Amino acid sequence: MKRRTLDLLFSIGGLGLAVLLLVVGVVLTTNANFANNYVHDQLAAQHISFKPAGQLTDEERKSACLREYAGQQLTTGKQAECYANEFIGLHLTSIAGGKTYADLGEPQTALREQVAQAEQAKAANLADLQKQLADVSAQRDTVFKGETLRGLLLTSYGFSEFGRKAEQGALAMYLGAALLLLLSAAGLVHAVRTPANAAFAAPEQERITN
């Protein structure tokens, strides 16, 4: 095979692959932009803002991201992760001592049974049991709302991470396409400069030894 033909084949193939990488890069960029814009719009619509730096409690100040985002509106995936884990997570721990919505179900049910029995028996501690039930019910309701919001924010963070990964993939595609374009251009230049009758890896003539 002639060297020029081989150069042209590799160069054209490289150009085709570069175009393919560019197309994949554009698709990934489009998906990344959609993910980022969607997360931004959904979070911005909730009108959630971080506490100003001057209003942070001692426990909240221990969080680097709460200090970093202090006073800002929550609009990005990283901010959502911070708010969910460092702010909501902290306050959920203080509300019920780290117990979850499911954990509080058993004591709530037990107190309901005790209240029902106390009402039938007209027990003297009925008012105290009713207060305990009201407190546990309020805690469980608050924890449920907090866990729900925390879960939604972490879902937004996860969605934004898909967008970030797509951006990284798009960058890799663009760099790969640029490299292939350069190599293909070099191959075309070499093909033009190569004599038309030049062969690729022509066999060496045998040496005649006396």
Predicted feature residues:
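Juxtamembrane interface at the cytosolic side of transmembrane helices
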Residues: 2-12, 162-210
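Long, solvent-exposed extracytoplasmic domains/loops
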Residues: 48-147
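Short, aromatic-rich amphipathic segments at membrane interfaces
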Residues: 127-176
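Juxtamembrane extracytosolic/periplasmic "stalk" immediately C-terminal to the first targeting helix
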Residues: 38-45, 200-205
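Hydrophobic secretory-pathway targeting helix
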Residues: 1-38, 189-193
